[in-house]
Structures are given as C-alpha cells and as structure tokens.
C-alpha cells in the first residue's frame, strides 16, 4: 500500500462537456482487470474567490494525474467558502453553469475522474443544495448526491452553525461505479450517521466511501480520525476523506488532516502537515477488500433488529 504527496505546476483547462446519467461501468471493470488502482485526495484552504480556488484545484489535479491517480477527491466547499452571511447562496449555480463547466473541462483535459464534494448548487433565490458531484475523465457528470444531514450545531467554544437556514437537504443515497470501484457518496456531517454508510455498503455494494469535508477545528480534533476509521471498519470499505484545512477568513477555520483509510481501518494515506495544501496518493487494493470481507463475512452475519 503506497502513499505519498507530490507538488507540480498545472496547465489551464479549455472546453466543456456535460451529461448527467446513471453509471454504465460494470462493477467488475476495476476489480477483475486491475487488482490495484491509484487514487488521490486533495487538501486545500478555500476562500471567497471562485477563480483562486479553481487555480488551486487545477494544480492539484495535475499533481494527481502525473502521480498516476485515476480519481482525485476534493473537500466540501472546494470551489467557494464565503466570509459573509449569504455569500454562498449568492454565488450558487446550476450544474450546467460556468463553475461546473470549468471543472468538467479540467477532468477531461487531465484525463482523470473528479469527486467534487460540497458544490453550491442553486435551489432558489434563498437556498442551495450541498451537492457532491462525480465527473468522469471525459468531462461528463456521472452522478450527484445532495447532502442529507445538515450541520445545525452549537460547537463547544461558542461557534454556532445553522446550515439548514440556507440549504435544502437531499433525500437519496447515491453510489456510482468508476475505474476505482463502486463509490459511495456522502458529505461531511453525514459521517456522524452510520446508517447511510451501512446502506451504501450492504445495499448498494460500495467498495470506496467518499467523505469530502470541512470539519471545524474543535470537532476535528475530537472526532475526525476515529469516525473515519470506524466507518471503514464497520463497512469493510476504503474511505477517502478530503478535507478543508486552516483559516479561510477571520471567522472560519477548518481542521484538515486529509486521510485515506483501508477496509481494516488502517490509515494508508496522510499528508505530513495537517493543514498544508497538497495531495495524498494511495493504492486501492481490491484483493484486500475481498480478503477482509471473506475472512470476516459481516454481510452474511448481520441480524435484523426491530426495536
């Protein structure tokens, strides 16, 4: 299991292609042709400037592509983090808008799949959807998931959050087949609700769980790694958790610590600096998934409990 970070320059993307469709890639594509496949997870500190964030994402995409990754995962709010109330709703766009157009072009020009967690998708004049978008290496949108569990929390230390005041929750659990296995899509606060991950694993047959996030510094220090490792262990899936990191503005700071975790709960990818911008790269080993699930067949041993 290899993991490392790299740093390179990027080239500017050009044209745009978009199509929304259900995945047509068979699950056996990745598991029978190649027993291992490389993935990357990005860490960044997004700000309230769409083009600045796109430049950072473009550079990280090129790093991942040159490292041989077939998929790179970005954190929640990759394209924008506002520093004033209402900013995120103001800049929200539909999936066929210019922001997503740029990222579709980037995926196609770089020949790599993108997991874009926490895109501000326009719902109406006062609300958005926190949408996880998966784009293939042809620049096509393969599927989307809208965050179901919204962050309405009083964080120890005085900060309060009310995501539901401007975000419409999703209602559908989503998985999508890809060259790196069957992906289970979630976003950030979903991590605290195991049932969605259980459904992705046991009902939708996910092999890799994606958790793009922007954990607060306080909650991240207390719970980030242990929650991620728990989700990996209880589902016997790889977990890729791309994280926002550091100070976005005077009011907001994210924990960072982007991680890739294997089905046994072992951290196999981690940046050396918890809050630095960069990527971590690791190999998804399908033989390990098979081995863990065969030796401990929890999918066959689960008992239905009605309370």
Curated annotation (Swiss-Prot):
Chain segments annotated as transmembrane: none
Domain CN hydrolase, residue spans: 37-286
Its EC number(s): 3.5.1.128
GO cellular component terms listed in the entry, alphabetical order: chloroplast; cytoplasm; plastid
GO molecular function, one term: deaminated glutathione amidase activity
Assigned protein family: Belongs to the nitrilase superfamily. NIT1/NIT2 family.
Protein name: Deaminated glutathione amidase, chloroplastic/cytosolic
Species per Swiss-Prot/TrEMBL record: Arabidopsis thaliana (Mouse-ear cress)
